[in-house]
Amino acid sequence: MQEFSLWCDFIERDFLENDFLKLINKGAICGATSNPSLFCEAITKSAFYQDEIAKLKGKKAKEIYETLALKDILQASSALMPLYEKDPNNGYISLEIDPFLEDDAIKSIDEAKRLFKTLNRPNVMIKVPASESGLEVISALAQASIPINVTLVFSPKIAGEIAQILAKEAQKRAVISVFVSRFDKEIDPLAPQNLQAQSGIMNATECYYQINQHANKLISALFASTGVKSNALAKDYYIKALCFKNSINTAPLEALNAYLLDPNTEYQTPLKITEIEAFKKELKAHNIDLENTAQKLLKEGLIAFKQSFEKLLSSF
């Protein structure tokens, strides 16, 4: 299925040197993503960073973080470069800008350009959150020919707006990361059983339609947050359900490994808009609104990445 790509949503030094290479070499994945929470988990819990951290003692916390993170990003970039050289739509690794800059467009643009210039790799995507000021950042980076991963996308309306900006201005590869499973985690406790474990897929599918109205060969929907939050669901539930044409799924290792045991052989047909609208109407009958939920989840996502980044910096 050439129009569906599987990426890995995980980064850690030992993994990059071993299992990451195996996944690439056997054709299981063709890209990867990182975020502040993943780096916090890796750097604070893995023994593979400790010697380097000791050598960097005395430097500012953010400088230590960037030294460690950029080394990992470069390593991932090198491993993925053959895929990029074969097909410039694949072979990317993403690095997020400082989450504390999300409400300052000018500083975000400056940091994004600095990081991209420092890394000096064509297959590095700079991640920008879909916040209010993020739209200005996306536009500026697109015009500067920087590959972009727009993250924390929950709202179909915002997904469409971002796709419209990128369709006009993107000169390099761009993906719009639609977060999936967090919807079900938020909504399922409030919804009757017959409506559970569906909100994330319904919302993601509507985002997919919005993105594809403007998508071109440079722009794709990327489904993120595709690890399950419920033990009642198969580990690869969201990967299989959202296996659409012209889409990417970035998955945590547990979901990825489960999917690889029994991968899809055909694309899924997305639900029709009429079916999605009928589902949303049923939710509203239970006082649940997906757009309001999307706004809430964006705020929570921005806070969570700041908390992870702060925890990581304070660990130094």
UniProtKB/Swiss-Prot annotation:
GO MF, one annotated term: transaldolase activity
An example Gene Ontology CC term for this record: cytoplasm
Keyword Transferase: yes
Role this protein plays: Transaldolase is important for the balance of metabolites in the pentose-phosphate pathway.
Pathway noted in the entry: Carbohydrate degradation; pentose phosphate pathway; D-glyceraldehyde 3-phosphate and beta-D-fructose 6-phosphate from D-ribose 5-phosphate and D-xylulose 5-phosphate (non-oxidative stage): step 2/3
Organism: Helicobacter pylori (strain HPAG1)
UniProt cross-references to SUPFAM superfamilies, sorted A to Z: Aldolase
Record has Transferase as a keyword: yes
Active site: 127 (schiff-base intermediate with substrate)
Catalytic reaction list: D-sedoheptulose 7-phosphate + D-glyceraldehyde 3-phosphate = D-erythrose 4-phosphate + beta-D-fructose 6-phosphate
Top-level enzyme category: transferase
Location relative to the cell: Cytoplasm
Designated name of the protein: Transaldolase
Gene this chain is encoded by: tal
GO BP of this protein: carbohydrate metabolic process; pentose-phosphate shunt
E.C. numbers: 2.2.1.2
Family that this chain belongs to: Belongs to the transaldolase family. Type 2 subfamily.
Gene3D superfamilies, sorted: Aldolase class I
Sorted UniProt keywords: Cytoplasm, Pentose shunt, Schiff base, Transferase
PROSITE patterns hit by this protein: TRANSALDOLASE_1, TRANSALDOLASE_2
Principal cellular location given in the protein's record: cytoplasm
Highest taxon above the source species: Bacteria
